[in-house]
Structure formats: C-alpha cells, structure tokens
A protein has these predicted regions:
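Short beta-strand/loop segment at the start of cytosolic alpha/beta domains
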Residues: 1-16
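Short hydrophobic/aromatic patches at helix-to-coil boundaries
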Residues: 2-3, 95-99
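Amphipathic alpha-helical interaction surfaces in cytosolic regulatory modules
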Residues: 21-97
Length: 99
C-alpha cells in the first residue's frame, strides 16, 4: 500500500511517502504530484522514513520531480531514506540530485 502526504512549511513543502513506490502505485503517486505539486513554486523536501520499497518506476518518478523542480529553479532534497533505498539511489547514480 502506498500513501503520500504534504505539509506546507515556512520555506518549503514537506512530502512524506509511506509504503511501496512501484509500478502498482505509479498512478496514485502521479495523481498526488499533479494535484499537490504541479502548481507549487517552492523548494521540496521528500521524507522517505516510512517508504519501504522503490522500484525503477518509482525512481523514474523521482527523476520527473527533479526535472520539474529544476524547471521552476527550485530544489528537491530526500531525507530519512532507508539503507536499501539509499543503495538504490547510489547504484543508479541519482543520489547527488537529491542532496
């Protein structure tokens, strides 16, 4: 099961992802991004503390978020990733994009 929440902070948006971000949750996450992030023009922090699993589909969605933020000249940072997710970000050479 996948869930996403967003909190507006003073200088950024905090997105908390829960569960598994994979091919099965792509539609839910895409809808969340379209409804909650598309029209925002703020820096983004994505908290992965409760994200258990991510596959290549999920990684692709992170790349899309990065590109969207870059177009807006805003940053995106990932925090609290579990070791398995950190390792996947390093193996795929995208960890530097989200620091």
């Amino acid at each position: 099961m996948f869930k996403a929440n967003i909190e507006e902070k003073n200088d950024h948006l905090l997105v908390k992802l829960i569960g598994d971000l994979d091919v099965y949750s792509k539609e839910d996450f895409s809808k969340f991004c379209d409804e909650s992030l598309k029209d925002k023009n703020e820096n983004l922090i994505i908290d992965l503390e409760k994200l258990d699993y991510i596959d290549s589909t999920g990684l692709g969605m992170f790349i899309n978020i990065y590109k969207d933020q870059k177009e807006k000249e805003k940053s995106v940072k990932v925090i609290n990733a579990k070791e398995n997710i950190k390792k996947l970000f390093k193996i795929t050479d995208i960890s530097d994009l989200f620091e």
